[in-house]
Amino acid sequence: MRLGFHMPLSGGVGKQLNRASELGMECIQIFSGNPTSWKPGKITPKSRDLFIKKQEELQIKPLVFHTPYLINLASPKNDIREKSIYLLNAALEKAKAYDAPYVVTHIGSHVGEGVEKGIDLVSYSLEKIMEDWPEGVELLLENTSGAGSTLGGSLTELKKIIDKFSGTQVLGCCFDTAHAWGAGYDISNVKEVETTLELVNEQLGLDLIKVCHANDTNVPLGSTKDRHQHIGEGNITDEGFGALLTHDSFTPKAVIMETPKNGTDCDQINLQRLKKVVGRHEEE
């Protein structure tokens, strides 16, 4: 597996690559643009070329793009849905420009219209995006904690969407551990991980998971709450993370941490903790 973090855009992506290298990261996730804006980030050929050159030099791969939080492919409001389609299209194009194989997105909320209606609207949105899909980029639908009318708390919801496009092979899943815990998927120890992965394989298919967001959380299991915590400071436990991430279905994945940035050395501490948990502490 390759371990890394979600990194802020401040200072430019080149600066973040250098920071990632200093910390010993092997992959990186960044936003495709301002996470709270409907305006997509611009692609500047010069900065893109410098980034790709630096990425190759440092061997920090893969680069994963995360879409802005505003996207709601399930919105019953046409204007919100159309803006979401536009923003997601821009993220996919940016990923192609930067040689990034994956774009991670939250699919959104049905806003009280019901799960099936929400799934239909997501499928409609993706059909529109499929009309001009950039080659070499895969869209990963992220599971959620299942709060309110948000889609993706149950992996079966993601599977229903992905199955509608089974012939395209451009859709997969990003599995977030904190979100899974909030949605009721217990991954706190070896036994529970084995049971949960059997369920995940049944509901979704382990082969569809291409990226893992490794985040601890201190919310109660099945609470539908979404709060990220530092590795080792929540309810998932070292045993749970170790059993999950060293499972055969997860070892080839890019593992991205989205842990709190509330200290200058918190990323370094989280990285070393996770390395130790998965049996790579000898690299320290």
Swiss-Prot record:
Zn(2+) 3 binds at H179, D226, H228. Its cofactor is Zn(2+). Zn(2+) 1 binds at H66, H106, E142. Endonuclease IV plays a role in DNA repair. It cleaves phosphodiester bonds at apurinic or apyrimidinic (AP) sites, generating a 3'-hydroxyl group and a 5'-terminal sugar phosphate. Its EC number is 3.1.21.2. The gene is nfo. Signal peptide: none annotated. Coiled coil: none annotated. The keyword DNA damage applies. Transmembrane segments: none annotated. GO terms for molecular function: deoxyribonuclease IV (phage-T4-induced) activity; DNA binding; DNA-(apurinic or apyrimidinic site) endonuclease activity; phosphoric diester hydrolase activity; zinc ion binding. It catalyses: Endonucleolytic cleavage to 5'-phosphooligonucleotide end-products. CDD domains: AP2Ec. HAMAP family: Nfo. InterPro entries: AP_endonuc_2, Xyl_isomerase-like_sf, Xyl_isomerase-like_TIM-brl. Zn(2+) 2 binds at E142, D176, H213, E258. Binds 3 Zn(2+) ions. One of its GO terms (biological process) is base-excision repair. Belongs to the AP endonuclease 2 family. Keywords: DNA damage, DNA repair, Endonuclease, Hydrolase, Metal-binding, Nuclease, Zinc. This is Probable endonuclease 4.
